[in-house]
Amino acid sequence: MKIYTLHAKQNLPISREQAWQFLSDPKNLKVITPDYMGFNIQAGADRTMYAGQIIEYIVTPILGIKNRWVTEITHVVDQEYFVDEQRFGPYALWHHKHFIKEIEGGVEMEDLLHYKLPFGYLGQLAHPFLVKPKLEEIFEYRKNKLVELFGSM
């Protein structure tokens, strides 16, 4: 079974502190997720991010099918990076690293996502036509939303 990778970088004209304050609040995930995803946090977003935090969502990632998604924040280094891992949800594996690096005039935000699909060979067949384009669309939406909120470099 194949493990896929999605890698994205974005520069924003804000401080590392501002970027961290926004990203470390789980409630802001709804802000940067397309409305059609039906994203709603069910539990676990009442505090800023910490290692061991469990966050439960309802999300409609593909074909209008509602999914319960549970992630754990497994690693946090204040104002540098955090990792979220799916504990229950639509993927066989979901390991998402978020990095923040100070650069001249702002920050570089980097996402490194490793994921595996369920359903073996059928999942692999669906990847290039359904899953990969949807994930790329979601990450592009996030990129545009962050520019709308914070400006561009």
Where are these regions (language model features)?
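Beta-strand elements of well-folded, non-transmembrane domains
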Residues: 12-14, 61-63, 75, 90, ...
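A short, structured loop/turn motif at beta-sheet edges
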Residues: 15-16, 74-81, 99-108
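Beta-strand/loop substructures that line and gate deep hydrophobic ligand-binding cavities in soluble
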Residues: 86-137
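Short, surface-exposed coil-to-beta transition loops
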Residues: 5-7, 66-70, 93-96
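Glycine-rich portal/gate segments that line the openings of hydrophobic small-molecule binding cavities
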Residues: 41-88, 141-144, 148-153
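Generic structural detector for well-ordered beta-strands
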Residues: 7-13, 40, 58, 72, ...
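Hydrophobic ligand-binding cavity/cleft-lining segments
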Residues: 1-50
